[in-house]
Structure formats: structure tokens, C-alpha cells
Amino acid sequence: MNNYDVMMMKSEDIYKLMKILTNIGWKSIRETSINRIIYISAVLYSFRNPDESNIFKEDYMFTITLSGPEDPDIENALVNLESNDVIAQSEEGYKVSDNASFSFKAKQDLRKTEWFEDIAYIVGIYGEDKIYDFIFRDPEYREALQGNSIYNLNIGEDNTTVKFLNSFKMAFEEKLYNKEDALDNRKYLELYFEYIFGKILRGEK
């Protein structure tokens, strides 16, 4: 894709993500939050869908910053959306404009929209702070930060965080009460994060 197509694709991603977050009660969202949620969406996609190519891998290029993962194109997409009156900016962050109308040129992958809905569900349950704490404990992110290096974070199948999450996957699935019941993405991630937050974020062994 050329630069214009990339901007339009990310503009649509951000707009749809913001609409989803608005529907679960968010009044506004900061640029750092958008970067973080899309980053964790990308990482968890490979964890949950190990046999599929990551739908974010070719589109997003995150670098390490002190405020979290950042894709510089996201800022351009926000400017594009704001200039077309699709979103509005305030001191609290960005929000979807009333009666926003915008004609997107990119071909949107419905899997991405559905995945954003699943991730927003998890963020809605556990809250921003806990999810963001998880990001800052993200092995891929911490390795880059501690190495004092600026480089593109790996969001594909070989991501260090995916390997970290997979190391707990077998033990987690053994604890599921109804192993024969197929869990949808939301329920699986909800139970998995409950397990991970207990084992990792509270320092339990």
C-alpha cells in the first residue's frame, strides 16, 4: 500500500476502535491509549490464533517509547480523522464526533473489527490501568526498554510476549472446568487474563 492507503486503513481502524470503546462507556481516548490497545490487540492475536498469519503484522510498525508502544502513522491518522470532523480533540483526549460521516477508501478486514471488539471487552472488564500494567511487563517491550534501544517491536508469531503467554497456556487450560466446551475469544481471554493477573501481576507462583 502507498502512504495514503496506509493512512486511510489506520484511520478506519482507529475510528472503529473508538466507536467500539464509546459503546462500552469510554467518553474519550488518548493517543497513547490508542497505540497501546492496538499493540496489545496485535500481540494477543498471535497468541489466540497461532496457526494464522497476524492480521496486524503487515500494517503496523510499533517502536519503543517511554510512554509505551507507538506507531507514528497513528498520529497522522488521528489528524486525518479530526480534519474531516470524524473525531474531536479535547483536554481529555479524542472522542467520536456526533453524526460523524466519513467515506473510507481502504478495504476493512472484518476479522480486525471483531478482534477489536473482543479486546475492548477485556479492557472493559479489567480496566485500562491493569491492561497497561500488563503491557509494561510485556517481555518484548521490557527487553527493548532495558536495552535502551529504539527499534521496531515484533508483533508477529515470534514475539517474546507470545512465547511468554504460551508458557502458561497448558497449565491454564488444565484448570478450565469444562475442557470439552469450546470457548469463544472473549471468554477464553477473560479467563486467561484472570489466571495471568493472579499468577504474574500479583507475584504469585
Residue ranges and their predicted role:
Residues M1-K205:
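Domain-edge interaction signal
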